[in-house]
Amino acid sequence: MAPQNLGTLCLLLLYLLGAAIAGRDFYKILGVPRSASIKDIKKAYRKLALQLHPDRNPDDPRAQEKFQDLGAAYEVLSDSEKRKQYDTYGEEGLKDGHQSSHGDIFSHFFGDFGFMFGGTPRQQDRNIPRGSDIIVDLEVTLEEVYAGNFVEVVRNKPVARQAPGKRKCNCRQEMRTTQLGPGRFQMTQEVVCDECPNVKLVNEERTLEVEIEPGVRDGMEYPFIGEGEPHVDGEPGDLRFRIKVVKHPIFERRGDDLYTNVTISLVESLVGFDMDITHLDGHKVHISRDKITRPGAKLWKKGEGLPNFDNNNIKGSLIITFDVDFPKEQLTEEAREGIKQLLNQGSVQKVYNGLQGY
């Protein structure tokens, strides 16, 4: 073999060896930069988990492998210690670590029975009893509505587990058809299972990740399939988190628009002013006025409202209403005369219907 070809082969072998030692690129699998925050990592996992779940890709022979890689990437990068080890030593430095079930990770975001990929509620077999659904109000701040967030909910969930012995049950009932004569049939419902393995309800701690999506609306619900009340003879109900946006001391939400009031002095209302409003994510909204601002005047800042839930690239407006703080001390006669001369404005005393048109 020529020396040049031998050198190329050695370089290729070294590259392959280095790649094998380095292992999988978890950042690339999740599609996030190495500087990604934990919120970015959770958001990326949740989005990709829906796309790559094997049940949604039955024709892809690598679907299970892709889903497992995604779960492994999330398990490492969502844990600060594992992430630090991975950043320093690569995947090889994690070989001795405990690995979680990727199905368990998925259930933290979507529930025990996964996600209904057809976009429709799970089909219910009427012959299978089902536990009650649970609806829990989840309070979120306007800051979370603006920027999005992941809320970790830890709950004690009653779960049916096997116990010694047998029990009577109604878990399986079938319709039996008996022919009574020509053209005559009788249908009866019969229990076809006389005894089942005994079960008992035990409390298990469950950690669920609820994604508060930007622009989420008050009253919207996030379902977790199979996380509701258990049923010893059937399947558990669902758990639904209902969004309840708490009142904000500065901003009021109306659709995708935000409303707020700003109080300025009488001097500022006459000669103008500059100021900044701190927005929900901390950025500053600058206001500059070089003309008279009347009490009740409104200023619209387009694109400074909340993100639209269906399209986060579209944002509403910030509507600012100005209040004027008049001096509380009485003016001297000299001051009054000075103001009259300065403004040079005559008397305007007009009486009219200010609510006309309503």
Curated annotation (Swiss-Prot):
- Residues where Phosphothreonine is found: T188
Q: Which InterPro entries match?
A: DnaJ-B11-like (IPR051736), DnaJ_C (IPR002939), DnaJ_domain (IPR001623), DnaJ_domain_CS (IPR018253), HSP40/DnaJ_pept-bd (IPR008971), J_dom_sf (IPR036869)
- What SUPFAM superfamilies does this protein's entry cite? Chaperone J-domain (SSF46565), HSP40/DnaJ peptide-binding domain (SSF49493)
Q: Which GO terms describe its cellular component?
A: endoplasmic reticulum lumen
State the CDD domains in the record: DnaJ, DnaJ_C
Modification after translation, per record? Contains high-mannose Endo H-sensitive carbohydrates.
> Which Gene Ontology BP annotations are present?
protein folding; protein maturation
Q: What is this protein called?
A: DnaJ homolog subfamily B member 11
- State the organism's lineage: Eukaryota, Metazoa, Chordata, Craniata, Vertebrata
